[in-house]
């Protein structure tokens, strides 16, 4: 489909524009389980702003089940440390709103309100493999079952 790696779209909106197909008509397979993503999963992939992966010049996304599973695997393998928001700002020399912080469970980028909630509730941000994570509002309410990082 896209032979030249330099010309490959990296985000779903770029792929949609390149193929001139709306999001809801895009058909992607999961890079892990090889199953076809549902329409909802394609839209979630776009909203999560993850990068498209190419296998044999074909674009792949990730289904919700595999995304949550491999997020947990990454947490177990690559967890480094946790810090409060004020400490994170001092470590990075950036404001909390200027940092890309993703949800530890669903990988959605946290909005400023979700980051502020961590500060208000005195919850920590986690460094997992050099990337900062927290919890989005949707995952905030779900109880953590295996680990309390």
UniProtKB/Swiss-Prot annotation:
One of its GO terms (biological process) is regulation of DNA-templated transcription. It is found in: Host cytoplasm; Host nucleus. The keyword Transcription regulation applies. One of its GO terms (cellular component) is host cell nucleus. A motif (PDZ-binding domain) lies at residues 147-149. Keywords: Activator, DNA-binding, Early protein, Host cytoplasm, Host nucleus, Host-virus interaction, Inhibition of host innate immune response by virus, Inhibition of host IRF3 by virus, Inhibition of host RLR pathway by virus, Metal-binding, Modulation of host cell apoptosis by virus, Oncogene, Transcription, Transcription regulation, Viral immunoevasion, Zinc, Zinc-finger. A zinc finger (unnamed) spans 30-66, 103-139. GO terms for molecular function: DNA binding; PDZ domain binding; zinc ion binding. Forms homodimers. Interacts with ubiquitin-protein ligase UBE3A/E6-AP and thus forms a complex with human TP53. Interacts with human NFX1 and MAGI3. Interacts with human IRF3; this interaction inhibits the establishment of antiviral state. Interacts with human TYK2; this interaction inhibits JAK-STAT activation by interferon alpha. Interacts with host DLG1; this interaction leads to the proteasomal degradation of DLG1. Belongs to the papillomaviridae E6 protein family. Belongs to the high risk human alphapapillomavirus family. The cancer-causing human papillomavirus E6 protein has a unique carboxy terminal PDZ domain containing substrate. Plays a major role in the induction and maintenance of cellular transformation. Acts mainly as an oncoprotein by stimulating the destruction of many host cell key regulatory proteins. E6 associates with host UBE3A/E6-AP ubiquitin-protein ligase, and inactivates tumor suppressors TP53 and TP73 by targeting them to the 26S proteasome for degradation. In turn, DNA damage and chromosomal instabilities increase and lead to cell proliferation and cancer development. This is Protein E6. It comes from Human papillomavirus 31. The gene is E6.
């Amino acid at each position: 489909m896209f032979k030249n790696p330099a010309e490959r779209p990296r985000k779903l909106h770029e792929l949609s524009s390149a193929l001139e197909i709306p999001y809801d008509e895009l058909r992607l397979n999961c890079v892990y389980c090889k199953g076809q993503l549902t329409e909802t999963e394609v839209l979630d992939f776009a909203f999560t702003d993850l990068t498209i992966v190419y296998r044999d010049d074909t674009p792949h996304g990730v289904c919700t089940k595999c995304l949550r599973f491999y997020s947990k695997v990454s947490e177990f393998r690559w967890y480094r440390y946790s810090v409060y928001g004020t400490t994170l700002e001092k470590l990075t020399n950036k404001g909390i709103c200027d940092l890309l912080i993703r949800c530890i469970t669903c990988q959605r980028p946290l909005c400023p309100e979700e980051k502020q909630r961590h500060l208000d509730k005195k919850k920590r941000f986690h460094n997992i493999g050099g990337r900062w994570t927290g919890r989005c509002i949707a995952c905030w309410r779900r109880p953590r079952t295996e680990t309390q990082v």
